[in-house]
Amino acid sequence: MIIIFDMRRFLICAFLAWAVAPFASFAQYTAAVLEINSKDGVYAVGDSIKVWANVTPECEAVQEFTVQEDMLHDILKQEMRLAPGRHLVYAGVCSKPVNYVFTFGKSGADRDYKKASIVGAIVAPETMRPGYKAPKDLRKFWDNQLKKMRKMPLESKLTPVPQEYNPDIVCFDLEIPMPEGAPVRGYVAYPKNADLKSLPIIIMAHAAGVKGGWCQCKVESVVKNASRGKGTIALDINAHGMLNGQPQKYYDSLEANELKGYSSWDFTGHKDFYFRLMYLRMVRALDYAVTLPQWDGERVFVYGESQGGAQAAALAGIDSRVTAVNLRVPAFIDVAGLYQNRKGSWPGKYSADPKKYAKILPYYDGAVLLSMSRAKMFVEAGLVDYTCPPSCVAAGFNNAASTDKTIVFFPYRPHHENRMPKDIRKRWSEEVKAPREKFREDYLQ
């Protein structure tokens, strides 16, 4: 159990000029700034953990300090009155694997960066394991799903798409019929004069939602991916089989009607579980990509953020042709976190009651599917991400069969990077985004 200072006694001292830790991390809040003694927020059992509050004269007289374990359990909630200065507000010894979230700000700020400073820590992430175990027939189940899908001959409809981003790249609107549900839809692009067997494949999957710009395939994005390295076969596949390039009212209507609340739809079995066909569309897209004569026959890189990370993890687990994967704060990784007494991953409806869905969800949980993947892997987790908790991401990472894998944590990252203050985003770009981009660029050279 972590050791906590007696705050009443401690706060008799209005200010203590503690030396800045050599690897201190900082979060932004206009009135106060939290700081921890670990650059990446990762600790081992037995390590000392310290949290300071740097209080400005603009800080309101009364602030609330909270400590939460595994994004479920408040272990400390205390009102504080601090004079301007730097104050040690928490100290202890890490005694077990756990994710901590520290919040200092206005009462009831609820992790709002505009009202509080927030920082996270994770202890012994390498020991964390998923809530669900792999079903004995996991491989057989997906092999049967692929066999049924492939009974339908692979056909593709390609429509040239004019683009001005790179004159050396050709781009097409892509549609591939499926035996069930919506077709695969997206864009494919590659260099005009590429040699046979010269290009890797890169597939982008999209985050959750329907009408948002982040949910839709973009010509600019696929052309940019096709231009990477010495050129690639780039696919940008949307999650739902939506038409590309439609007026916004088309996507608004889908979100309000046919696809409303899709991530929390109930189901009776595999057949009506929405994510089954979402994952199969990813495989079908790859089935098409590997038929292109420009493919080098070896490299397949897939990446995505949030729900896109779920799709990327699924494809890496289901399909051994995937050789490298980048998972960015991935969703649907350890939805059964409650089995380990921690918050489970998105989708929230399923993680709130993992026992109810235990006969179906293990076949789709990325933490389970990654047990079948030997792909080279780079994974990112945010230590204050309540949508895709870092303990869940760590559990999935640990469960991956890959022996060439890297995970990075960032102590101030919530689920959406643009919610971090500007100075923190700059640090994140240097410490997380830069190595993430290098991982991709090195692989695609």
Which residues fall in each region the model found?
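N-terminal cap/lid segment of alpha/beta-hydrolase-fold proteins
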Residues: 37, 41, 150-194
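Short beta-strand element of the alpha/beta-hydrolase
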Residues: 197-209
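Cap/lid segment of the alpha/beta-hydrolase catalytic domain
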Residues: 208-280, 337-345
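Short alpha-helix in the alpha/beta-hydrolase fold that links the catalytic acid
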Residues: 217-218, 375, 389-398
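Hydrolase active-site cap/lid region
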Residues: 246, 309-356, 409, 419-420
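Short beta-strand/loop motif that positions the catalytic acidic residue
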Residues: 373, 379-381
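Acidic catalytic loop of the alpha/beta-hydrolase fold
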Residues: 383-388
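C-terminal catalytic histidine-bearing segment of alpha/beta-hydrolase fold enzymes
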Residues: 394-445
